[in-house]
Protein backbone atom coordinates (compact mmCIF):
# COMPACT_ATOMS: atom_id res chain seq x y z
CA UNK A 1 0.00 0.00 0.00
CA UNK A 2 2.81 2.38 0.83
CA UNK A 3 4.42 1.73 -2.55
CA UNK A 4 1.14 2.40 -4.34
CA UNK A 5 0.61 5.60 -2.37
CA UNK A 6 4.08 6.83 -3.31
CA UNK A 7 3.44 5.93 -6.95
CA UNK A 8 0.15 7.81 -6.96
CA UNK A 9 1.63 10.79 -5.12
CA UNK A 10 4.56 10.95 -7.52
CA UNK A 11 2.26 10.72 -10.53
CA UNK A 12 0.02 13.48 -9.22
CA UNK A 13 3.00 15.73 -8.52
CA UNK A 14 4.19 15.26 -12.09
CA UNK A 15 0.68 15.94 -13.37
CA UNK A 16 0.34 19.09 -11.30
CA UNK A 17 3.71 20.29 -12.52
CA UNK A 18 2.68 19.61 -16.09
CA UNK A 19 -0.55 21.51 -15.63
CA UNK A 20 1.23 24.47 -14.07
CA UNK A 21 3.80 24.45 -16.86
CA UNK A 22 0.96 24.38 -19.37
CA UNK A 23 -0.68 27.37 -17.71
CA UNK A 24 2.64 29.23 -17.79
CA UNK A 25 3.06 28.41 -21.49
CA UNK A 26 -0.44 29.62 -22.24
CA UNK A 27 0.22 32.92 -20.49
CA UNK A 28 2.53 33.75 -23.38
CA UNK A 29 -0.43 33.35 -25.75
CA UNK A 30 -3.13 35.77 -24.55
CA UNK A 31 -5.65 34.44 -27.07
CA UNK A 32 -5.55 30.96 -25.50
CA UNK A 33 -5.21 32.03 -21.85
CA UNK A 34 -7.58 30.31 -19.43
CA UNK A 35 -9.55 32.02 -16.71
CA UNK A 36 -8.70 30.89 -13.17
CA UNK A 37 -11.96 28.93 -13.10
CA UNK A 38 -11.19 27.19 -16.39
CA UNK A 39 -7.69 26.34 -15.18
CA UNK A 40 -9.12 24.95 -11.93
CA UNK A 41 -11.53 22.74 -13.89
CA UNK A 42 -8.80 21.62 -16.26
CA UNK A 43 -6.48 20.67 -13.39
CA UNK A 44 -9.29 18.80 -11.62
CA UNK A 45 -10.28 16.70 -14.63
CA UNK A 46 -6.67 16.07 -15.66
CA UNK A 47 -5.75 14.82 -12.19
CA UNK A 48 -8.91 12.71 -12.10
CA UNK A 49 -7.91 11.19 -15.45
CA UNK A 50 -4.49 10.44 -13.97
CA UNK A 51 -6.11 8.74 -10.97
CA UNK A 52 -8.33 6.62 -13.21
CA UNK A 53 -5.32 5.66 -15.32
CA UNK A 54 -3.53 4.38 -12.23
CA UNK A 55 -6.65 2.37 -11.37
CA UNK A 56 -6.56 0.96 -14.94
CA UNK A 57 -9.95 2.47 -15.76
CA UNK A 58 -8.61 3.49 -19.14
CA UNK A 59 -11.92 4.17 -20.90
CA UNK A 60 -13.01 6.66 -18.24
CA UNK A 61 -9.55 8.26 -18.16
CA UNK A 62 -9.60 8.64 -21.95
CA UNK A 63 -13.03 10.31 -21.80
CA UNK A 64 -11.86 12.76 -19.13
CA UNK A 65 -8.78 13.68 -21.15
CA UNK A 66 -11.00 14.45 -24.11
CA UNK A 67 -13.12 16.57 -21.78
CA UNK A 68 -9.95 18.41 -20.74
CA UNK A 69 -9.49 19.41 -24.39
CA UNK A 70 -12.98 20.92 -24.47
CA UNK A 71 -11.78 23.23 -21.69
CA UNK A 72 -8.39 23.90 -23.27
CA UNK A 73 -7.89 22.53 -26.82
CA UNK A 74 -4.20 23.50 -26.71
CA UNK A 75 -3.32 21.69 -23.48
CA UNK A 76 -0.13 19.79 -24.22
CA UNK A 77 -0.41 17.66 -21.08
CA UNK A 78 -3.79 16.24 -22.16
CA UNK A 79 -2.68 15.90 -25.78
CA UNK A 80 0.41 13.96 -24.74
CA UNK A 81 -1.58 11.59 -22.54
CA UNK A 82 -4.19 11.04 -25.26
CA UNK A 83 -1.41 10.29 -27.72
CA UNK A 84 -0.25 7.42 -25.49
CA UNK A 85 -3.74 5.91 -25.58
CA UNK A 86 -4.01 6.25 -29.35
CA UNK A 87 -0.62 4.62 -29.84
CA UNK A 88 -1.54 1.79 -27.46
CA UNK A 89 -4.68 1.22 -29.56
CA UNK A 90 -2.51 1.08 -32.71
CA UNK A 91 -4.07 4.32 -33.96
CA UNK A 92 -0.76 5.86 -35.01
CA UNK A 93 -2.13 8.76 -37.13
CA UNK A 94 -4.24 10.08 -34.25
CA UNK A 95 -1.40 9.53 -31.79
CA UNK A 96 1.08 11.32 -34.03
CA UNK A 97 -1.28 14.25 -34.59
CA UNK A 98 -1.82 14.65 -30.84
CA UNK A 99 1.91 14.45 -30.12
CA UNK A 100 2.73 16.96 -32.84
CA UNK A 101 0.22 19.41 -31.40
CA UNK A 102 1.58 18.86 -27.88
CA UNK A 103 5.10 19.69 -29.07
CA UNK A 104 3.90 22.67 -31.09
CA UNK A 105 2.11 24.11 -28.06
CA UNK A 106 4.88 23.35 -25.55
CA UNK A 107 8.19 23.21 -27.44
CA UNK A 108 10.19 23.58 -24.22
CA UNK A 109 9.01 20.23 -22.85
CA UNK A 110 11.83 17.81 -23.61
CA UNK A 111 9.80 14.65 -23.03
CA UNK A 112 7.05 15.61 -25.47
CA UNK A 113 9.66 16.23 -28.16
CA UNK A 114 11.52 13.03 -27.28
CA UNK A 115 8.30 11.03 -27.57
CA UNK A 116 7.55 12.51 -30.97
CA UNK A 117 11.10 11.93 -32.22
CA UNK A 118 10.88 8.28 -31.16
CA UNK A 119 7.53 7.92 -32.92
CA UNK A 120 8.89 9.42 -36.14
CA UNK A 121 11.71 6.88 -36.07
CA UNK A 122 9.30 4.01 -35.40
CA UNK A 123 7.16 5.17 -38.33
CA UNK A 124 10.31 5.39 -40.49
CA UNK A 125 9.73 9.13 -41.04
CA UNK A 126 13.44 9.84 -40.97
CA UNK A 127 13.29 13.37 -42.41
CA UNK A 128 10.83 14.52 -39.76
CA UNK A 129 12.88 12.78 -37.08
CA UNK A 130 16.08 14.49 -38.20
CA UNK A 131 14.47 17.93 -38.30
CA UNK A 132 13.04 17.51 -34.82
CA UNK A 133 16.23 16.02 -33.35
CA UNK A 134 18.38 18.77 -34.84
CA UNK A 135 16.01 21.32 -33.33
CA UNK A 136 16.11 19.51 -29.98
CA UNK A 137 19.91 19.48 -29.99
CA UNK A 138 19.79 23.29 -30.11
CA UNK A 139 16.90 23.82 -27.69
CA UNK A 140 18.03 21.27 -25.10
CA UNK A 141 21.77 21.84 -25.00
CA UNK A 142 22.16 19.82 -21.78
CA UNK A 143 20.79 16.66 -23.41
CA UNK A 144 22.96 14.25 -25.38
CA UNK A 145 20.23 11.82 -26.45
CA UNK A 146 19.16 13.87 -29.51
CA UNK A 147 22.76 13.89 -30.77
CA UNK A 148 23.15 10.14 -30.28
CA UNK A 149 19.85 9.56 -32.11
CA UNK A 150 21.09 11.74 -34.98
CA UNK A 151 24.35 9.80 -34.99
CA UNK A 152 22.45 6.55 -35.44
CA UNK A 153 20.30 7.92 -38.28
CA UNK A 154 23.23 9.49 -40.14
CA UNK A 155 25.24 6.27 -39.75
CA UNK A 156 22.40 4.20 -41.21
CA UNK A 157 22.07 6.66 -44.09
CA UNK A 158 25.85 6.62 -44.62
CA UNK A 159 25.95 10.43 -44.39
CA UNK A 160 29.46 10.31 -43.04
CA UNK A 161 30.13 14.04 -43.15
CA UNK A 162 27.15 14.54 -40.85
CA UNK A 163 28.31 11.68 -38.64
CA UNK A 164 31.66 13.44 -38.18
CA UNK A 165 29.97 16.78 -37.51
CA UNK A 166 27.71 15.17 -34.91
CA UNK A 167 30.63 13.36 -33.25
CA UNK A 168 32.43 16.71 -33.04
CA UNK A 169 29.38 18.23 -31.35
CA UNK A 170 29.31 15.39 -28.82
CA UNK A 171 33.05 15.81 -28.26
CA UNK A 172 32.49 19.52 -27.69
CA UNK A 173 30.10 18.69 -24.84
CA UNK A 174 31.88 15.68 -23.33
CA UNK A 175 35.49 16.41 -24.13
CA UNK A 176 37.87 14.16 -26.06
CA UNK A 177 37.75 10.44 -25.39
CA UNK A 178 39.33 7.34 -26.89
CA UNK A 179 35.91 6.00 -27.84
CA UNK A 180 34.95 9.13 -29.81
CA UNK A 181 38.36 9.32 -31.47
CA UNK A 182 38.17 5.69 -32.57
CA UNK A 183 34.67 6.21 -33.94
CA UNK A 184 35.85 9.23 -35.94
CA UNK A 185 38.85 7.18 -37.11
CA UNK A 186 36.48 4.48 -38.36
CA UNK A 187 34.24 6.99 -40.16
CA UNK A 188 37.14 8.79 -41.81
CA UNK A 189 38.35 5.44 -43.15
CA UNK A 190 34.87 4.85 -44.58
CA UNK A 191 35.23 8.25 -46.28
CA UNK A 192 38.70 7.21 -47.54
CA UNK A 193 40.14 10.21 -45.70
CA UNK A 194 43.25 8.54 -44.30
CA UNK A 195 44.91 11.80 -43.31
CA UNK A 196 42.16 12.82 -40.88
CA UNK A 197 41.68 9.20 -39.82
CA UNK A 198 45.23 8.82 -38.54
CA UNK A 199 45.22 12.35 -37.16
CA UNK A 200 42.44 11.22 -34.80
CA UNK A 201 44.55 8.47 -33.25
CA UNK A 202 47.89 10.26 -33.08
Segment roles from a protein language model:
Residues 16-81, 88-93, 97-100, 104, ...:
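N-terminal leader/linker segments that initiate helical-solenoid repeat arrays
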Residues 67-70, 100-104, 134-138, 168-172, ...:
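Conserved structural position within tetratricopeptide repeats
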Residues 54-55, 88-89, 122-123, 156-157, ...:
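Register position in tetratricopeptide repeats
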